[in-house]
Amino acid sequence: DTSGQIDAQALLSVTPPPQMPATMEAGTIYGYCVGEPWNQQAVFKGIGVPVITDYEIWKNNPEKVFGVSKAWAEENPNTHIRVVKAMIRAAMWLDANNNANRPEAVKILAKSSYVGADADVIANSMTGTFEYEKGDKREVPDFNVFFRHNATYPYYSDAIWYLTQMRR
């Protein structure tokens, strides 16, 4: 049943994002929903293609969430503020000068102590292009927006919306 109905036969499982391409390649899973660079990894390996990107669903969306408990925030107010400020500064840096810092960010993220994926794979979604399948590489200048358009501003209303959607 591929109609998306409630009795559709699909097995949902939890797999850490970096392991998703290898798990699919091994035949343990048949598809996955994940942020980049793991979709691009499937394209590069020739084992899968993205069906749709989050950019096509909701442009300039907050793609990741940094959430802490109220207790932790109250116990660590200075640390909490500093971490949020650091993330906002990093987002500003990534979008500065028409994304001029992205190639440097790709080199940093490709290190094994960070994301550890190949720089070419990370660059595909960080530097204004996206490869939907082998040979179908498209210009998508705002595929990843980190600060422009207030994309990652910590709006309370966004947090509430996400929580209500997860509860459904």
Enumerate the language-model features and the residues they cover.
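Short helix-initiation/N-cap motifs at beta->coil->alpha
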Residues: T2-A26, P37
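Solvent-exposed loop/turn segments at secondary-structure junctions
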Residues: Q19-M20, P37-Q40, E56-K59, W72-A73, ...
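Alpha-to-beta junction loops
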Residues: E25-V34, G46-G48
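A conserved hydrophobic position in a structured secondary element of the catalytic/binding core
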Residues: V34, V68, E75
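Ligand-binding "clamshell"
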Residues: Q41-Y55
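Small-molecule pocket liners
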Residues: G48, P62-A71
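Secondary-structure end/capping motifs
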Residues: E75-R168
